[in-house]
Amino acid sequence: MELVNVLENEHLSMLNHSCAHMMAQAVKRLYPNAKFWVGPVISEGFYYDMDLGDVKLKEEDLAKIEKEMKKIAKDGKRIVREEISKEDALEMFKEDPYKIDLINGFEDGNITIYRQGEFADLCRGPHVETVKMCKNFKLLKHSGAYWKGDANNKMLQRVYGICFDTKEELEAHLEALEEAKKRDHKKLGKEMGLFTISEFAPGMPIFLPDGMILRNILEQYWYQEHTKEGYQFIKTPIMMSKELWELSGHWDHYKDNMYTSMVDDREFAIKPMNCPGALLVYNSTLHSYKDLPLRLGELGQVHRHEASGALNGLFRVRTFTQDDAHLFVTPDQLEEEVKKVLQLVDRIYSVFGLPYEIELSTRPESGYIGSEEIWDASEKALAQACVHAGKEYKVNPGDGAFYGPKLDIHIKDSLGRVWQCGTVQLDMNLPERFECKYVDADGTKKTPIMLHRVVYGSVERFIGILIEHFGGHFPLWLAPRQFVVIPVHHEKHVEYANKVCDALTALGMRATVDSRNEKLGYRVREAQLQKVTYQIVVGDGEQENNTVTIRQSGKKDSVTLSLDEALAKFKAEVDNKTLFGK
């Protein structure tokens, strides 16, 4: 069961684009005074922003719009492309201030519109041939959206939808959407007691005890894997002076997203990124070429101001921990170090059952620093590192940062959604700005290349992804609540239940006994709702035969094993970081 990414399919993109126009046509019929802003295709389908005056859409209004859309689709009008002059366009849309604003932003010359029946809209296209092709659609939700995304502007109404070629494809996608709702990390995070967010600290997650267990496991695993690869770990200040951020360039380009404070008549800022701190560590001592590569890792907490309307659980926050590492390398070490990073990424993502794709972003057309020769060599090194790591990659021409090319790593979760988490960014800028040097073999001082890289990205966001990826049913090694031992009778079997629990805790497992005077079914259901990885039921048979009956979270079937067999099974699952179903 996977959600479809509309943008990955050219035909599906056209179909959804045309369906957005069909929706706008239906809205115009139902609300003749409607004014329209834009209606783009997005990965989840399409949306259209509209001004309906005093009309505030309700959930039931979407059904009315759908009914009108079905009439339009049944009529099957052709979708016709036309070219008109800018002057004619201004005349055609003179009653719609939002379209006038768009038109005034266009260069002089002809403008394309697309027409279907009585409805016409500004659009570059392309579109499908007829609206009849858009009959398999669903309007998904509606929300508010500021015009041009500016909170100082008027609030418009946004309606989302999606369209497919066939009814079966639509139904499958809607089923996947329902599954995604059940897996919503905000919902599961609350039910499982993992995290909360207080009105007193918006965008700043508070991790609860079980959430801290999960977080600590992820961070310990990160430290273990990086230690194997020769990383050294640092911790840099959370607040540093304005002068540092001016030196790094963040003050010029990122000031509006930074939290600042005056201390002893001197301006400071809470760090939005960890990079400058790593550069201070590098410059704290002299370096020879023999010291390189130098791999500095930091699980560093950063703060970035985000608009309140953009905040979303663990996915969009104002403070998070970035699993940064900054590698200082010589040019001839670059390819090998990137290859090692990719191998590390592969090892970590595979543990979570997360396939991924790599995208190489190359030199922008203008505004970049460094010579073309350096860029070409750097891009080649990144590409060759992918090849030598046995990884395919796609090229994203011109999308590199001004200071260097990069590899973006996009993971795919169990619902087919793509998340950009890992990055390997080559930086030719900051080492120059901070005057970082090393003494080369010939005795001359040279500037190292710096690699910024993350694997999890944001630890908090990665936790949110994992909650939804696993639907809360974490593999045993990762689960905050691994076992609950449930005696059939709260008194008769409690001694044996405690024996089983003690055997589990002796192996370092997290286990409790639920011996409350409640019905067995109630206690089992509660453990299922809490997504305890294994529920272990013990009664007369288990007590007499030294066995346990185990049921895995999210499963209906149970199995009975000897206690020794069960303990060996559980230990192997933790040691091997086994994924369920593997």
Where are the model-predicted features located?
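NTP/phosphate- and nucleic-acid-binding module
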Residues: 1-37, 41-582
